[in-house]
A protein has these predicted regions:
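Non-catalytic, usually N-terminal nucleic-acid engagement modules in DNA/RNA processing proteins
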Residues: 16-73, 77, 83-88
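A short beta-strand-to-loop transition that corresponds to the Sensor-1 phosphate-sensing loop
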Residues: 26-27, 75-78, 150-153, 169
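Compositionally biased low-complexity segments enriched in histidine and/or tyrosine
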Residues: 1-2
């Protein structure tokens, strides 16, 4: 999963010894962006709510510009049911339907990600967090520092010496990067696998 050189920053590849993989949870970030603008949605000249698109792109661009990943991918949940439905048919049955504005935003977001030449990961029957967890653990074995970009606290159970949770800024508060010490302190636990 490689991101081509973006921009004209001569320092972009200055530290090639550190391989930095950013894995974005597309669905979680799109939902977060949509609801961040819920009281003042961004509407374009055609009447389309672009809140989710704008928020997602801001997060993506901030990562590319400020973090300078050597590798990057965006994971999306697949359409349809996941393997969990086989074991628990009521899985996510109580969830509200996806808002239409979010559904309308996904094709545009996919096109934007493709336009950046960033790989999209979507595996039938596996949610984005399953894919990200698997990729993060594999990349760690291959010497990467991995940043799981998501507001979803469930990812904290995957944090290790080289795998971090990267929570994008909210309302200008700055980015939260959580490693093992931060996770243990935040949840008052002794091991990250206690986050459930």
């Amino acid at each position: 999963i490689y991101i081509p050189y973006l921009g004209s920053d001569s320092n972009h590849h200055s530290n090639m010894s550190e391989k930095k993989l950013f894995l974005l949870d597309g669905h979680a970030l799109v939902y977060r962006a949509h609801f961040a603008f819920i009281t003042r949605p961004l509407i374009n000249s055609k009447g389309m709510n672009t809140s989710a698109i704008t928020g997602f792109v801001r997060t993506l661009w901030d990562i590319i510009k400020n973090e300078k990943p050597t590798h990057i991918a965006v994971a999306f949940d697949p359409k349809g049911e996941t393997f969990r439905h086989e074991y628990f048919p009521e899985y996510k049955a109580g969830r509200d339907a996806t808002p239409e504005d979010i559904t309308n935003a996904f094709p545009w977001i996919h096109k934007i990600v493709e336009g950046f030449d960033i790989p999209i990961v979507s595996i039938p029957t596996y949610e984005a967090d399953d894919a990200i967890g698997t990729l993060a653990k594999q990349a760690e074995k291959e010497g990467f520092k991995v940043y799981m970009v998501t507001p979803d606290k469930d990812y904290a159970q995957l944090v290790s010496e080289n795998i971090f949770m990267y929570k994008p800024s909210r309302q200008g508060n700055g980015v939260d990067i959580l490693g093992v010490p931060e996770v243990l302190e935040k949840w008052g636990i002794k091991r990250v696998d206690q986050v459930i």
